[in-house]
């Protein structure tokens, strides 16, 4: 059941695009009937991998994030390419970021970490 609807008859107003991500603006009617202009970051989604070694150790990567101007320990992850299955993205990102390959892949579901202003879904 959808509680929010797009009231525009025309496509979204694309304010900016970069590397498959776009900043979009649209008129939206909220559940209380109020119409607002809402800005959303549109993102193609990402695969996030929780790599666990046979001995139980979890593999993380140390990655510099310019937006925060600091190093962070993170799970391997990456943006899903157009028409790429999530599982293939996970395999690709695990190899690219860690050099590891997985014996088994198990889906742990999905999260939407920035749902207030971004439509990115992260598949675990």
Task: Give the location of each predicted region.
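Extended interaction-bearing regions that mediate binding to partners or small molecules
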Residues: 2-16
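Conserved Nudix-box catalytic region and its N-terminal flanking loop in Nudix hydrolases
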Residues: 2-4, 41, 47-92
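Glycine-rich, charged/polar anion/phosphate-binding loops
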Residues: 10, 34, 109-111
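Acidic, metal-coordinating catalytic segment for phosphate/diphosphate chemistry
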Residues: 12-48, 53-54
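Active-site segment of metal-dependent pyrophosphate-handling enzymes
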Residues: 22, 44, 52-54, 65, ...
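Conserved hydrophobic/aromatic beta-strand scaffold that supports enzyme active sites
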Residues: 23-27, 60, 124
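Gly/Ser/Thr-rich helix-start
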Residues: 34, 79, 117
């Amino acid at each position: 059941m959808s509680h929010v609807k797009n009231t525009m008859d025309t496509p979204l107003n694309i304010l900016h695009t970069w590397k498959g991500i776009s900043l979009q603006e649209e008129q939206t009617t909220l559940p209380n009937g109020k119409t607002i202009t809402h800005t959303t970051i549109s993102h193609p989604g990402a695969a996030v991998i929780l790599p666990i070694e046979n001995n139980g150790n979890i593999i993380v990567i140390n990655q510099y994030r310019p937006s925060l101007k600091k190093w962070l320990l993170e799970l391997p992850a990456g943006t899903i390419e157009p028409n790429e299955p999530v599982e293939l993205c996970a395999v690709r990102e695990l190899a690219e970021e860690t050099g590891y390959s997985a014996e088994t892949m198990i889906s742990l579901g999905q999260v939407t970490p920035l749902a207030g202003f971004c439509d990115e879904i992260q598949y675990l």
